[in-house]
Curated annotation (Swiss-Prot):
The gene is ghrA. It comes from Klebsiella pneumoniae (strain 342). Its EC number is 1.1.1.79, 1.1.1.81. GO terms for cellular component: cytoplasm. It is found in: Cytoplasm. It is an enzyme of class 1 (oxidoreductase). PANTHER family: 2-HACID_DH_C DOMAIN-CONTAINING PROTEIN (PTHR43333), D-ISOMER SPECIFIC 2-HYDROXYACID DEHYDROGENASE NAD-BINDING DOMAIN-CONTAINING PROTEIN (PTHR43333:SF1). The keyword NADP applies. Keywords: Cytoplasm, NAD, NADP, Oxidoreductase. This is Glyoxylate/hydroxypyruvate reductase A. Belongs to the D-isomer specific 2-hydroxyacid dehydrogenase family. GhrA subfamily. InterPro entries: D-isomer_DH_NAD-bd, GhrA_Enterobacterales, NAD(P)-bd_dom_sf. It catalyses: glycolate + NADP(+) = glyoxylate + NADPH + H(+); (R)-glycerate + NAD(+) = 3-hydroxypyruvate + NADH + H(+); (R)-glycerate + NADP(+) = 3-hydroxypyruvate + NADPH + H(+).
Length: 312
């Protein structure tokens, strides 16, 4: 079995060594420009078109939860990866736990009004504030994939009303489900904290815009853990400046690294991290990929295959 590997920042020798340990008999090599030798599987992140084009592969694995970089290239180069070759993404591999930690910590930060107390501290003011009630602090999650389900699960013990919005109806315990465009408005009108975990598709690009934000209750919060392209940053800033939004926590941006001239840097009610909410953990990802390849080789069912029409 021949496997080609391409990632510009991962420790490639480590990945090759560990994959070969978990897949006895496999030969894993780093792909470099000009390598046209046969391969059975490709493990990639933002691959050049020539890496995949014309290859008779059994499957391609994206080394992350998102596959938008591959799908965007396919629009211009449809022969890069024929539909007959399945495309897989990392379903969890430790990312679910990281998203849980991030989401719970930020929701609690806002619920306990630590943002307000930090502002008072900077103003040298000693002022106890009224508490928020958990049963009135509704958290709405946009996106009902593996990560959205994990985040909802982690928030349940805290007593917040939970709701989810997705393409199709979900039956999650203790979570109110809204589905499709027809129910988006109702979902938003009752949401105090909006958590975005949507996939990056043509339908979701720019979804967090002026129209959407206007439907949230006054003094709501936005937590973006998905993709920067989901947020129209000018509309987000306008909502913050008008008081419609009380705060925003952003892990992803339309341009990364975030340009120095971006007004997001200096805004007092914007907090941010540099796209680190959930990173690929090598050993968990390697084990998932090795197990999935082994199941494919045995002809057994697997999960994680991307529906290219939907984009996730």
């Amino acid at each position: 079995m021949e496997i080609i590997f391409y990632h510009q920042t991962f420790d490639t020798p480590f990945w090759i060594r560990e994959l070969e340990k978990q897949l006895p008999g496999a030969r894993v090599r780093e792909w470099k420009a000009g390598d046209n030798q046969p391969a059975d599987y490709a493990l990639v992140w933002h691959p050049p078109v020539e890496m995949l084009q014309g290859r008779a592969l059994k499957a391609v694995f994206a080394l992350g939860a998102g596959v938008d970089s591959i799908l965007s290239k396919l629009r211009d180069h449809p022969d890069m990866l024929p539909l007959s070759i399945p495309l897989f993404r990392l379903e969890d591999t430790g990312m679910g736990r990281q998203m849980q930690e991030y989401a719970v910590s930020q929701v609690l930060h806002w619920f306990r009004r630590f943002d307000d107390y930090q502002a008072l501290k900077l103003a040298s003011r000693w002022q106890p504030l009224p508490e928020y009630r958990a049963d009135e602090f509704t958290v709405g999650i946009m996106g009902a994939g593996v990560l959205g389900a994990k985040v909802a699960e982690s928030l349940q013990p805290w007593g917040f009303p939970l709701r989810v919005w997705s393409r199709s109806r979900k039956s999650w315990p203790q979570v109110q489900s809204f589905a499709g465009q027809a129910e988006l408005g109702e979902f938003l009108q009752g949401t105090r904290v909006l958590i975005n975990l949507l996939p990056n598709t043509a339908e979701t690009a720019g979804i967090i815009n002026q129209t959407l934000l206007a439907q949230l209750p006054d003094e709501s919060y936005v937590l973006n853990l998905a993709r920067g392209v989901h947020v129209v940053e000018e509309d987000l800033l306008a909502a913050l400046n008008s008081g419609k939004l009380k705060g925003a926590m952003l892990d992803v941006f339309s341009r990364e690294p975030l340009p120095q001239e971006s007004p997001l840097w200096a805004h007092p009610r914007v907090a941010m991290t540099p796209h680190v909410a959930a990173v690929t953990r090598p050993m968990e990802a390697i084990t998932y990929i090795a197990e999935t390849i082994s199941r494919l080789e045995r002809g057994e069912p697997v999960s994680g295959q991307v529906d290219r029409q939907r984009g996730y």
